[in-house]
Design a protein with these regions (language model features):
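A detector for small-residue-rich transmembrane helices and their helix-helix packing motifs
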Residues: 1-206
């Protein structure tokens, strides 16, 4: 299932690189979704801006997917992927619904859901980054990245899909809890710390 997702994403992304009309037809766009083209909520996840964007998303997906596949199996893996994909774009839609020109592509929501599901299942998993070679527990990264995404979404000073990351992350967390409710007891504090920034962000917005 993982390699099928990767293959489809690569093939469709390459098609989008070469064919601008294809790219524009299937990318996420607020006005188009409002006009009934709901398929863009899904199709946009298989398109990417360039090879760097494509590589980063798929590399991240590869790093975190096996943990979920081994722990939960292929069916639950695809459920997490698809639900996170949709809600990453849905969260983006709600965030930018008054900006009809807003467009986005990429599997960021789906990948983010997989990443945060893996973090919830394996919070002590060590992560090593090129610019930060010291092994870091995944839960530290998870909390930090949510805070960074909320900050980035508020600042609106880059081209990163922070809202898709956030929507995908919260979806991945919730679906993982539904699939494996015992995690509420074993990871109570981690769940609280991961969800708290969303609650604060909603409260500040109001």
């Amino acid at each position: 299932m993982l390699y099928l997702i990767i293959a489809l994403t690569v093939l469709i992304s390459i098609k989008g690189f070469k064919d601008h009309s294809f790219f524009n037809k299937y990318k996420f766009n607020i006005s188009s979704v409002k006009n009934g083209e709901k398929y863009r909520m899904f199709s946009s996840a298989f398109l990417h801006v360039d090879f760097n964007h494509l590589f980063f998303n798929l590399f991240t997906l590869l790093v975190f997917s096996n943990q979920i596949l081994n722990e939960l199996g292929g069916l639950y893996y695809i459920i997490i992927y698809i639900v996170s994909l949709y809600f990453g774009n849905y969260y983006t839609y709600k965030q930018y619904k008054n900006n009809g020109f807003y467009s986005a592509v990429g599997a960021s929501g789906a990948v983010s859901g997989i990443v945060y599901s893996a973090i919830l299942l394996f919070p002590e998993m060590k992560l090593v980054f090129i610019l930060f070679p010291i092994p870091l527990p995944s839960y530290i990264f998870g909390i930090g990245y949510i805070l960074y995404s909320i900050y980035g979404m508020k600042k609106l000073n880059d081209n990163i899909g922070h809202s898709a990351h956030l929507g995908g992350a919260i979806s991945g967390i919730i679906i993982t809890i539904i699939i494996k409710p015992s995690i509420i007891v074993s990871q109570t504090w981690l769940i609280f710390l991961l969800i708290l920034p969303f609650i604060i962000e909603r409260f500040i917005k109001k």
